Amino acid sequence: MYGIKIYNTLTRKIEEFKPVSPGFVKMYVCGPTVYDYNHIGHGRVYVVYDALKRYLALRGYHVLHVMNITDIDDKIINRAHQEKRDWREIAETYTRDYLESLGKLNVKVDLHPRVTEHIKEIIEFIQILIDKGYAYVAPSGSVYFEVDKYPEYGELSGRTNKELWSQEKEFISEKKKPYDFALWKAWKPGEPHWDAPWGKGRPGWHIECSVMSSRYLGRQFDIHGGGTDLIFPHHENERAQSEAAFGVKPWVKYWVHTGMVMMGSEKMSKSLGNIIPLREAFKEWGPETLRLWYLTSHYRRPLVFTEESIRQAQKYYERLVSVTNTIKKLSREAVSLHRMNDEDLKILEKLLEIRSRFHEALSNDFNTPQALAVISEFMTLVFKEIQYNPKYMLVLTAYKLLREFNTVLGVLDKYLVETPEELETLLDNVINIVVDIRRELRERKLYDLADRIRSELGKHGIILMDRGKETTWMRRK
Ligand SMILES: Nc1ncnc2c1ncn2[C@@H]1O[C@H](COP(=O)(O)OP(=O)(O)OP(=O)(O)O)[C@@H](O)[C@H]1O
Ligand SMILES: [Zn+2]
């Protein structure tokens, strides 16, 4: 099997993937600021890391996936003021929308830490930075990270020129340097606040991710994700804070960033007003199509929204459903044969070669569009060859492969489970076979075996009634 390789934004190279602890992958992804409905740009981040996690799990790793919820922030406070609502209510409303969206997209996150539930840890972390001389308290009571104390600043984003570091201009008058950034924001009237040793206030944005990732994943972990829009300043700042506080290098082994969902040549963004909310997209195209659409482009590339590209994803999804139904039908009807001819062997080899290329694509910097192209070849093989040569072994192998593909795609779950009706039919068929064999046993006067079958089935509520040579049966409800 292919070794997994992944692109690391920090080194700008595709690297061999080796987690800090063998077999255990710790992954942190920057989640949403819950001040508005999620749009289809956010959905890409959710789906890409979920699919990556599923692939790593398929390759035998245990993955712990943490995604934070930013439930206190300038954007939430502003929204609360605009709408004259409590900031907690705003956060609650859009957290619900976020969690519902994940459910629809079939994204499973292991832990969802919220900032407001980690204020104590945030204060302790800031205190460490102050004690170690990396942070200073301004006269207002705000606390800033002193960027000049961390020599590696700018490496992640490739901004080696300090001129390009300037941020949080509104605090410029009290910062030592224009590029220092807030760890703690002093309280202003009308704003939520918590008590801290240097005065009441609330956490800055970047500190939460350093704190919550280390709280759940330890002081060093494997994958840190989020959109490319977060590389500067957010991830640059997170890295500076964490490496300064822990003295561990590297804090994160692989920085993995997803490209932006674009509207034409612009990033899809609330502030530009060019968004499509996820909940509308679900109604229009369905979550499965959307999930596949995200995977049609390489995760590092921008993904430009067009109706045509979504329609293509929809067609692909319909074909996947159709191939699933075909395989299920064949698996019910296929005959088990003990012999295999050369033609069968060739098809079996083709199936296994497809499987191998599926893994080759995904293990090489998680190339999902290539994996989808390989699955497309698989579908053609089922429709053009296996359908007309439904040997049990070929059908079963195809079924197994489809399940394996879906482990990553995550769009066929409802088609791959047997429905209650299908299970009923299966059970009826199995009982009929047992009853038939029992009739033969009775004909051969092997009454002890026949009686044992009747009493064993009886224990499971299946009652056999003999009348002469014939046997009828019923299920005790
Ligand atoms: N257009 C987009 N395409 C892909 N990912 C995006 C897009 N916009 C935001 N993200 C990602 O979604 C996650 C949550 O982002 P966050 O809540 O900070 O978004 P935001 O910046 O508030 O959105 P907006 O720019 O629309 O206001 C982050 O990982 C971010 O990188
Ligand atoms: Zn973050």
Swiss-Prot record:
UniProt short sequence motif 'HIGH' region, positions renumbered to this chain: 32-42
Binding, Zn(2+): C30, C209, H234, E238
Keywords, in A-Z order: Aminoacyl-tRNA synthetase, ATP-binding, Cytoplasm, Ligase, Metal-binding, Nucleotide-binding, Protein biosynthesis, Zinc
Positions annotated to bind ATP: K270
Alphabetical GO biological process terms: cysteinyl-tRNA aminoacylation
Cofactor note: Binds 1 zinc ion per subunit.
Localization terms from the record: Cytoplasm
Reactions catalysed, as given in the entry: tRNA(Cys) + L-cysteine + ATP = L-cysteinyl-tRNA(Cys) + AMP + diphosphate
Main location: cytoplasm
One Pfam family linked to the record: CysS_C
Matches recorded under Gene3D superfamilies: Cysteine-tRNA ligase, C-terminal anti-codon recognition domain, HUPs
Enzyme Commission code(s) on record: 6.1.1.16
Family: Belongs to the class-I aminoacyl-tRNA synthetase family.
Database matches in HAMAP family: Cys_tRNA_synth (MF_00041)
Protein name per its UniProtKB record: Cysteine--tRNA ligase
